[in-house]
A protein has these predicted regions:
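Short, well-ordered beta-strand segments in beta-rich or mixed alpha/beta enzyme
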Residues: 29, 37-39, 82-95
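A short, structured loop/turn motif at beta-sheet edges
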Residues: 75-84, 99, 112-120
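Short beta-strand edge/turn micro-motifs at domain boundaries
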Residues: 103-136
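Short, cysteine-centered beta-strand-loop-beta hairpins and adjacent loop/turn segments enriched
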Residues: 62-63, 92-103
Length: 136
């Protein structure tokens, strides 16, 4: 389980850092359970494939550079073959409107569903955090 999840985290980081937003979207479940994204930038959760597709289109049109590096903090198997993961993600995004990079760190909680030998994200909750210098 852990090696497949670490591979998913690496793929997530690589695709974001390459601005392969379509590739990031492919890491998500598109069937059942319905995908859910909860992030600070939205007043309400995004639920379902259509809302996520609009989100990916917005993101792809607004970014010109990205760098993402995430660390898997924990992964727990839940009932029904589901997995809960906690990641610490350090990121830098530069929008199309300027050359100023926006950097930060976020805690991310994923719920994953097994699909063959891989996992797909069906729930992503992210909150930016301000950590002390030297925090691992």
């Amino acid at each position: 389980m852990t090696s497949a999840i670490k591979a998913l985290v690496s793929e997530y980081d690589e695709k974001w850092s390459a601005l392969d937003v379509a590739g990031v979207a492919e890491l998500w479940e598109r069937g059942t359970p319905q995908p859910v994204y909860i992030g600070d930038e939205y007043a309400a959760p995004l639920v379902g494939v259509d809302e996520l597709d609009r989100h990916w289109a917005r993101v792809a049109s607004r970014l010109k550079r990205a760098s993402v590096s995430s660390r898997l903090v924990s992964a727990d198997e839940l009932a029904g073959g589901l997995v809960r993961c906690i990641l610490l993600s350090r990121w830098s995004f530069t929008g199309t409107e300027s050359d100023t990079a926006h950097t930060g760190t976020s805690w991310i909680t994923w719920l994953l569903i097994a699909r063959g030998n891989t996992y797909r994200i069906f729930h992503h909750m992210e909150a930016q955090v301000y950590l002390d210098e030297g925090y691992p």
